[in-house]
Regions:
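A short, active-site helix/loop in glycosyltransferases that binds the activated sugar's phosphate group
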Residues: 21-44, 51-56
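Conserved donor-binding/catalytic core segment of Leloir-type glycosyltransferases
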Residues: 58-90, 97-100
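Nucleotide-activated donor-binding/catalytic signature segment of Leloir-type glycosyltransferases, i.e.
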Residues: 110-131
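Aromatic "clamp/platform" in nucleotide-sugar-dependent glycosyltransferases that forms part
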Residues: 148
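Short hydrophobic beta-strand element within catalytic cores of glycosyltransferases
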Residues: 165-168
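Conserved acidic donor-binding segment of nucleotide-sugar-dependent glycosyltransferases
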Residues: 180-191, 200-205
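A charged, aromatic-enriched C-terminal amphipathic alpha-helix characteristic of glycosyltransferases
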Residues: 203-226
């Protein structure tokens, strides 16, 4: 996981011992290899997580520009960053935020319910079955990954194969999947920068096409047959 790769290995002796014992290590995107100490890199391979688009693709919402966030509500995911950014949008923006994921603590549950009450753009759907989640991603105009760290988020591959562009924090796990030249990055925790990207994607068709075309070019990498 991202926490293992980008946090625990550096100071966790048990994690380091596991690396010593392993004959082969797998990371989920190519940048992950460089997060490992030099002595482990030679026995490390990259395996991208594959994904299949849903069998039935739903049409995007007609009157709203739907943005989806997928992931359980944990601090490392910075789960309310997109909701916070949506509050900064101008009144005439059609952006709405659909949030899919379970609240793993009572405080996260309270925060999600409170956000729904104060933010008319935000809807929290809780945990959904995988097929429903994939349909929601495919219906969306954008997927946002706001995590502080990721080993290689499978939701990115699910969005890419569904033809849904991604906005992501500028983190190694996303750089390895989307490429360093992808135009849809924002700094960790930067609500204003995310709001600006959201509005640009909604209002600038050229920018949105750049995001979409870039993702479509990478879709074959996540084909199960690849």
């Amino acid at each position: 996981t991202g926490t293992d790769l980008y946090h625990d290995i550096a100071g966790n002796q048990a994690a380091q011992h596991s690396l010593d014992l392993a004959k082969r290590l797998i990371v989920l995107q190519p940048y992950g290899i460089h997060a490992l100490p030099d002595e482990y890199q030679k026995k490390t391979v990259t395996v991208l997580q594959s994904a299949k688009p849903p069998a039935v693709l739903l049409k995007p919402l007609k009157h709203n520009f739907e943005v989806t966030v997928v992931g359980n509500l944990r601090a490392v995911k910075d789960p309310f960053r997109t909701a916070m950014a949506s509050r900064l949008l101008p009144d005439d923006s059609r952006i709405v935020v659909t949030h899919i994921g379970a609240a793993l603590t009572p405080s996260m549950n309270t925060r999600a319910n409170r956000e729904e009450q104060i933010n008319h753009r935000y809807t929290w759907r809780g945990s959904l079955a995988q097929n429903l989640t994939l349909k929601a991603i495919a219906r969306s105009r954008l997927l946002v990954v706001s995590s502080k760290m990721e080993g290689g988020a499978n939701v990115i591959s699910e969005a890419i194969v569904a033809g849904t562009p991604v906005l992501s924090t500028h983190i190694s796990g996303s750089l390895g999947m989307l490429g360093k030249d992808y135009p849809g990055y924002f700094p960790i925790g930067d609500t204003v920068a995310l709001a600006e990207l959201l509005l640009q994607a909604e209002t600038d068709t050229t920018f949105y096409k750049q995001l979409r075309d870039h993702c479509l070019k990478r879709a074959q990498r996540f084909n199960p047959a690849a």
